């Protein structure tokens, strides 16, 4: 079973995506902020990380950059999910280490 770490602080978004992905047979792990996302990435070693960018405690850009510095998890693909729609937000996410936006 494919394991996905979803780093998101909005409960409505978590509910919606969790329902859809679980119906498709994915195992979902939830983290509510960037630091928790880093911790869960190390603990759970997911196949994919879906990263919100606007998070409390540590934003998704910073969390992504930190994950990419950790040998154990640096190769996990990270896809940024965000309401930020400006090209500079996309560029910043890709520079931080996201595989896609």
Annotated model-derived regions:
Residues 8:
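Conserved acidic carboxylate
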Residues 14, 56, 74, 86:
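The feature encodes the CheY-like receiver
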Residues 15-23:
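Charged docking surfaces used in two-component/phosphorelay signaling
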Residues 25-32, 40:
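Short hydrophobic/Thr-rich beta-strand motif most characteristic of the beta2 strand and flanking loop
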Residues 44-50, 55:
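Active-site beta3 strand of CheY-like receiver
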């Amino acid at each position: 079973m494919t394991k996905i770490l979803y780093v998101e602080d909005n409960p409505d978004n978590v509910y919606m995506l969790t329902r859809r992905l679980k119906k498709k047979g994915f195992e979902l792990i939830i983290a509510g902020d960037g630091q928790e996302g880093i911790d869960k990435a190390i603990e759970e070693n997911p196949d994919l990380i879906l990263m919100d960018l606007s998070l409390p405690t540590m934003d998704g850009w910073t969390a992504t950059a930190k994950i990419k510095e950790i040998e154990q998890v640096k190769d996990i693909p990270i896809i940024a999910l965000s309401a930020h729609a400006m090209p500079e937000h996309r560029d910043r996410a890709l520079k931080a280490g996201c595989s896609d936006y």
